[in-house]
């Protein structure tokens, strides 16, 4: 990932951590002024050569959320304009840097803002399908794209405004007035994707298993609290570390399949047990 900032003006910054404040200019593209240029390259350690993606003129463009195909023959990039209201999912040949003929694979526009924050993720049991995350219905959700089934890239209106176009058959995996925060991984045995979401409450973070075929979701672990979750390599278990207003801290090993026993690793004592505590309520 190469960034050329030679054309960007210097912006004066003051370093106050030195004994006497010093001036340390920083590259900052002010609104309406020239921005940096980016190029994405693939370095081959065997040949010691770099092939750059032939993405065209990099002026006022951002290349984000870079990911590989499972066979390592292709590179996927979400390209964003400087206004950050037009996103394109594109694929390139990893050996030549040439773009795929049916690029873009997905296109999303909005009058104000699009926010692609996650690279695509292929299903470990089916490399012809991948998951794309989008906020096109107003909340960040998962969309399953099938590369075996091409469709005419017709423009569709999005629920949150703007529009989108798809080159592959696409199915929305999750939906609702809540946010998918991130993908932890997969349980290949149950064919489920393990996610963190705000479905229980916007003030919480909970783990869920989502069946890729049906879209059905299953809560993993305790419903209450803010959960920090680590997924095992197999995807069969999580280490769930969580707290709430009434739970000081619990750490548990929880099966993601919904079957089996939860094992408690830690049940912390309440350090405020001897105090008369007020009733805590939170509103939005």
Each language-model region and where it sits:
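Beta-strand C-termini and the immediately following turn/loop, strongest in propeller blades
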Residues: 1-4, 30-34, 69-70, 76-83, ...
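Carboxylate/His-rich catalytic cores and anion/metal-binding grooves
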Residues: 16-26, 33-37, 82-100
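Short loop/turn segments that connect beta-strands within beta-propeller blades
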Residues: 44-48, 94-97, 147-148, 211-215, ...
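Cysteine-rich, disulfide-stabilized extracellular repeat modules
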Residues: 101, 126, 138, 166-169, ...
């Amino acid at each position: 990932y190469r960034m050329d900032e030679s054309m960007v003006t210097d912006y004066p910054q003051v370093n106050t951590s030195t004994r006497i404040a010093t001036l340390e200019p920083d590259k900052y593209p002010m609104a309406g002024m020239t921005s940096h240029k980016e190029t994405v390259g693939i370095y081959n350690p065997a040949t010691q050569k770099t092939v750059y993606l032939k993405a065209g003129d990099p002026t006022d463009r951002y290349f984000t959320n870079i990911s590989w195909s499972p066979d390592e023959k292709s590179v996927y990039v979400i390209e964003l304009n400087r206004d950050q209201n037009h996103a394109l999912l594109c694929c390139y040949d990893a050996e030549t840097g040439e773009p795929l003929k049916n690029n873009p694979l997905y296109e999303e526009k909005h009058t104000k803002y699009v926010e692609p924050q996650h690279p695509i993720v292929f299903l470990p049991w089916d490399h012809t399908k991948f998951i794309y995350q989008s906020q096109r219905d107003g909340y960040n959700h998962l969309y399953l794209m099938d590369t075996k089934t091409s469709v005419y890239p017709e423009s569709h209106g999005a629920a949150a405004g703007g529009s989108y176009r798809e080159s592959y058959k696409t199915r929305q995996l999750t939906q609702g007035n809540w946010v998918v925060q991130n993908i932890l991984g997969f349980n290949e045995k149950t064919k489920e994707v393990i996610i963190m979401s705000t479905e229980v409450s916007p003030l919480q973070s909970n783990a869920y298993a989502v069946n890729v075929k049906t879209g059905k979701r299953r809560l993993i672990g305790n419903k209450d609290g803010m959960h920090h979750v680590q997924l095992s390599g197999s995807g069969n278990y999580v280490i769930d570390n969580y707290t709430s207003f009434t739970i000081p801290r619990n750490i548990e090993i929880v099966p993601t399949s919904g079957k089996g026993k939860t094992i408690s690793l830690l049940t912390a004592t309440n350090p405020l047990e001897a105090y008369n505590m007020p009733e805590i309520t939170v509103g939005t």
